Amino acid sequence: MNEPTVQPSRTSSAPASPASPRGWSDFCEQHAAAAARELARQYWLFARAHPQPPRADLVSLQFAELFQRHFCREVRESLAGPPGHDYRATAPPRPALPKARSSEDLGPRPACALQHLRRGLRQLFRRRSAGELPGATSDTNDIDTTAASRPGPARKLLPWGLREPPTEALKEVVLRYSLADEAAMDSGARWQRGRLVLRSPGPGHSHFLQLFDPPKSSKPKLQEACSSIREVRPCTRLEMPDNLYTFVLKVQDQTDIIFEVGDEQQLNSWLAELRASTGLGLEHPDTELPLSLAAEPGPARSPRGSTDSLDQGASPGVLLDPACQKTDHFLSCYPWFHGPISRVRAAQLVQLQGPDAHGVFLVRQSESRRGEYVLTFNLQGRAKHLRLVLTERGQCRVQHLHFPSVVDMLRHFQRSPIPLECGAACDVRLSGYVVVLSQAPGSSNTVLFPFSLPHWDSELGHPHLSSVGCPPSHGAEALPGQVTPPEQIFHLVPSPEELANSLRQLELESVSSARDSDYDMDSSSRGHLRAIDNQYTPLSQLCREADV
């Protein structure tokens, strides 16, 4: 009897778990091999117990026929009931997989793909929404409650930011703007193009401004609530001689911004809208005059509302800020201190003689930073501005340099060049200064007093004056007609009476011979005098007459 020889099984009783199939062909190959190994092992076990077993090829054909029948029945039952366990005891139970058209669908699907999509859309439209003020936060529970109240697909797909009404834009315009920072003080205004939007978040909330640069940008470059704006006013012709329709916006703890619109109608419209939004419309009714009124001559106005004093230098009649009053008494007695004149006016004063006045200077109050000061000087015919910081004790700081006083700073820059970005090519030392004196006791208008009057010394280059009076202080504490005790640093200044007599004599002389005098009458200024040359005094007397 030919009986088959029983062969030991070459397969392990506990094979390793097969790797995940990459496709249907791999799936069938993998499970067919596993079923063949199991069938061969069972075949040899059965052959040992039963003599004369059938041939292996016959067993495989019968197994394939029966396998097809049982496999189809198991698949139909697995769709209706819970998934059954695999017939292989060594393999872990696997969840039944639905029918798929590709191998990518064989793995388990994500738990909530729609939820991830909705979260991503919500974040996207949140950034594009121009809704809330900076610092405002939204509560997640409120968002979910609002979304849950929406029926249908809008509740599941659309984010809350898209369904809420957008913030109302009250006013919008494309314009030019410039930041009034330290760089603008040195090199002039640098204009940029942007879009200014005034928005209202709703009743009970403060309006806020947004500045977009470039104009088509969706994210604002600057955004401030209107409640933080402390001043909004039109610029004067002296401040912006080449830009007519401009206004300045002063924001608390921020750099001042100058805006330029297209015409006067837009200027007045924006000023009215901003003043109404900030509540500054009634608090500063006479801060500045409109451009059309400032350019026309008219009757004399009060010192607070007059713009004539801006054309003549300082304005002692205007009440100063408390920050300025703390430090102005260190400078108000000196003839080179011009008080609160504009940057443009200071540049005009030091540029009158062009490159010949190289090193001529004056000291003025800062326009943008109240309580600070600016040294304006002539650099080869161009005006430069250097910011000064003055402490309550009179100490002065210029960039990284510290001085005991402003006079010590001027003495230092008389001997050493002023530190500038251009280096040795822009070497400049202080050589003289522009003088400003009060025209009469108690007068709010000032004029430039040239040093060719009343006596001229060609050797020393400075006048010999008979009086030792000091000009009235620019501070609010100076009374009309009161003469401050002299502190002679550069030269001696005449009394107000002598100045008035000299000015009256100049008016008579200017009628007969305009060029014989160092003044020129300006018809547009209604009798005021303006200096045209010889308005400087050398700084060489600074060391000689100091501490007298």
UniProtKB/Swiss-Prot annotation:
The modification Phosphoserine is found at S13, S102, S129, S302. PROSITE patterns: SH2 (PS50001). It comes from the Eukaryota. The keyword Metal-binding does not apply. InterPro entries: PH-like_dom_sf (IPR011993), Phe_ZIP (IPR015012), Phe_ZIP_sf (IPR036290), SH2 (IPR000980), SH2_dom_sf (IPR036860), SH2B (IPR030523), SH2B3_SH2 (IPR035059). Residues 1-11, 137-148 have a biased composition (Polar residues). Belongs to the SH2B adapter family. Residues 1-25, 78-108, 128-160, 290-313 are annotated as: Disordered. It comes from Mus musculus. GO terms for molecular function: protein tyrosine kinase binding; signaling receptor complex adaptor activity; stem cell factor receptor binding. This is SH2B adapter protein 3. Residues 168-279 form the PH domain. One of its GO terms (biological process) is intracellular signal transduction. Keywords: Phosphoprotein, SH2 domain. Residues 12-21 have a biased composition (Low complexity). CDD domains: PH_SH2B_family, SH2_SH2B3. Tyrosine phosphorylated. The keyword Cell cycle does not apply. Links T-cell receptor activation signal to phospholipase C-gamma-1, GRB2 and phosphatidylinositol 3-kinase.
